[in-house]
Amino acid sequence: MRKKIKLALAIVMSVVALWGSAQRPRQPDLHWQAPAQAAAQPNPLANQPQTEVGGRKLFRRLCSSCHGLAGAGIGQAPNLRSFDTQVQTDGTLFWKITNGNLDRGMPSFADLPGLERWQLVLHLRHLEEPAKGP
């Protein structure tokens, strides 16, 4: 009887582990690059940390259904707290928010006012500390 329970438990744990690995967020797309001029653009709100609150509200409304409230990614959406994301310039993140990447499920937010997109970038910078790179 104990062997059957152990076997059943092992099978259940294996299925859970396999399912969990299939649900990992995508790695950032290294071919989705902002043009140099866009990447070099500084965040005009960088010295106004109080505006991050607006970015947090926008993130909850527009982004959390895919990236989660903490930005760690749900399903195939990338972890926005990761080193690979956080190492990108503010201008690059702004460009990606603006243009999107429909091949990867990221919509364009070009219709969102520019300052609100910059607030989102500022909020991304306030997410939990990024994981260390390789």
List where the protein language model places each region.
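Gly/Gly-Pro-rich "capping" loops immediately C-terminal to redox-active cysteine motifs
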Residues: 52-56, 68, 72-98
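The canonical Cys-X-X-Cys-His
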Residues: 55, 59-69, 120-124
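Electrostatic cytochrome c docking/interface patches
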Residues: 27-58, 129, 134
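Hydrophobic h-region of N-terminal signal peptides that target proteins for export
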Residues: 13-20
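Boundary at the C-terminal end of the N-terminal hydrophobic targeting segment
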Residues: 20-22, 38
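Conserved beta-strand positions that form and line the central face of beta-propeller blades
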Residues: 44, 79, 105-108
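Bacterial N-terminal signal peptides that target proteins for export
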Residues: 2-9
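C-terminal capping alpha-helices of c-type cytochrome domains
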Residues: 109-134
